[in-house]
Regions:
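N-terminal targeting leaders
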Residues: 2-166
């Protein structure tokens, strides 16, 4: 009897491992068209972020939730657009323009991602003060509800706080 239980456990573990491997190898795309752009590129050794890539199974899981986000705000008359994600296509070009025109960030390598009116900053800066200044600058852009600051000082790969491009 114990051999049977062991065999079942081995089969279950193998099935889980096979499923995880299949998901890891599944093609991943920016299925939701989340805006993801490089804003500056002064530090060529800066680790490149992966960006918003999803496997087909993840897209199916997230589609309903993403379709609903921001609907109650719109119905109450507090929001201009019926879905939080619809703002991102407008916000990210304004963020890019603002950061490029500012002049304080020309010595950085920065990528920005827009998801649900939240702007995620990824890349490399010269100092912690510069990272804070970048975050504060992005908070000033119209329609931005928040900023996720994943910037790192310098270009060391081991200091990266975001998934890297493959």
């Amino acid at each position: 009897m114990s051999n049977r239980l062991l065999w079942c456990a081995v089969l279950a573990a193998s099935a889980c491992a096979a499923q995880a491997l299949a998901q890891a190898q599944a093609p991943r795309t920016n299925a939701f068209n989340d805006p993801f752009v490089q804003v500056t590129s002064a530090l060529p050794a800066c680790p490149v972020p992966e960006g918003p890539l999803y496997a087909e199974a993840e897209v199916r899981e997230l589609a309903h939730v993403r379709a609903q986000h921001g609907g109650s705000c719109y119905r109450a008359g507090r929001c201009r657009l019926p879905n939080s994600y619809l703002y991102d296509a407008e916000i990210i070009p304004r963020v890019r323009l603002y950061l490029r025109e500012d002049g304080r960030f020309d010595d950085t390598s920065i990528w920005v991602l827009g998801e649900r009116r939240l702007v995620t900053l990824m890349g490399c800066v010269q100092s912690a003060e510069q990272a804070r200044a970048l975050e504060k600058a992005v908070e000033l852009v119209d329609d931005v509800m928040g900023v996720v600051n994943l910037l790192q000082v310098g270009t060391e790969r081991s200091a990266t706080r975001y998934p890297l491009a493959r």
